[in-house]
């Protein structure tokens, strides 16, 4: 891959990520021994009695913090990362819950929300730096420098059955919109061409997808995970720039991040 192509691919991939997150580009085990199959398939396991929502303070305590996920940098999302719910538009109304999840917007009914950015730390193995890639030292430099995954986590609490209802709404939207839709975030349109369900377990319910978007003939894969535990729902949007650039990079679900959040909600 020529240097100019590498740079162009990096810019295009960055733009695709920013369109989905506006400005926030950034398999856990079942500890209680519950039915993994049900969780993996997103089956409903709504509480028999109304659940009490975590307060804003309790939610902050349950949110991820530096040191919770090995080899990552965890920070609290700032004002520049926020996307207002009314700033997300879709061409198919049924797909709005998915567009919200991809943008870090809480699902309907949330009483409190906090957000985190979890970014892989560069490996100290002598790989190429971002500076090398910018200078155009070839495809290997691009792959080494950008083979880092960023995950945006939105953790929300709900009263009563609103948590299970929000999870169910997202599950239905993902099924209804598997064939694609167009989302416009902060005025920037993004064409989602497919949503493919992946296997994941955790919490009371968990679902995951590979979401593929398209721009100027180039496709960009991202990962989306939803986890519900009690009255809390977390969504995870993960993006790997090298994978988006078409490099031969294995881009997995952010299972370590999901597992860490699941544990903190115990």
Task: Mark where each language-model region is.
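Sec-dependent bacterial lipoprotein signal peptides
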Residues: 1-23
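N-terminal low-complexity, Pro/Thr-rich disordered segments
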Residues: 10-11, 21-64, 90-93, 100, ...
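Extracytoplasmic/periplasmic mature domains of Sec-exported, cell-envelope-associated bacterial proteins
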Residues: 46-79, 211, 219, 247-255
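Extracytoplasmic/secreted envelope proteins and their assembly/folding machinery
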Residues: 60-66, 164-171, 255-258, 262
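Sec/Tat-exported extracytoplasmic proteins
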Residues: 63-76, 174-181, 261-265
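A small/polar (G/S/T-enriched), proline-flanked helix-loop surface module common
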Residues: 75-220
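Post-signal peptide N-terminal regions of Sec-secreted extracellular proteins
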Residues: 160-163, 175-178, 244-245, 250-266
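A short, solvent-exposed beta-edge/loop patch
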Residues: 193-258
């Amino acid at each position: 891959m020529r240097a100019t192509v590498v740079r162009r691919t990096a810019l295009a991939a960055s733009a695709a990520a920013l369109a989905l997150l506006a400005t926030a580009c950034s398999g856990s085990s079942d500890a209680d021994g519950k039915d993994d199959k049900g969780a993996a398939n997103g089956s409903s396991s709504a509480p028999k009695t109304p659940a009490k929502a975590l307060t804003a303070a309790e939610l902050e305590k349950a949110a991820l913090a530096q040191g919770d996920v090995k080899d990552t940098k965890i920070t609290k999302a700032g004002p520049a990362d926020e996307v207002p719910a009314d700033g997300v538009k879709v061409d198919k109304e049924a797909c709005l819950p998915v567009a919200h999840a991809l943008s870090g917007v809480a699902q309907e009914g949330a009483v409190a929300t906090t957000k985190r950015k979890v970014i892989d730390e560069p490996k100290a193995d002598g790989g190429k730096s971002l500076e090398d890639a910018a200078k155009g030292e070839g495809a290997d430099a691009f792959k080494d420098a950008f083979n880092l995954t960023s995950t945006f986590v939105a953790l929300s609490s709900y009263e009563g059955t609103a948590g299970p209802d929000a999870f169910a709404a997202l599950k239905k939207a993902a099924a209804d919109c598997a064939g694609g839709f167009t989302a416009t975030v902060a005025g920037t349109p993004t064409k989602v061409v497919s949503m493919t369900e992946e296997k994941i377990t955790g919490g009371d319910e968990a679902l995951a997808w590979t979401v593929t978007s398209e721009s100027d003939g180039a496709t960009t894969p991202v990962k989306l995970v939803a986890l519900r535990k009690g009255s809390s729902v977390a969504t995870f949007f993960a993006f790997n720039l090298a994978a988006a650039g078409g490099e031969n990079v294995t881009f997995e679900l952010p299972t370590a991040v999901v597992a860490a959040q699941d544990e903190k909600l115990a």
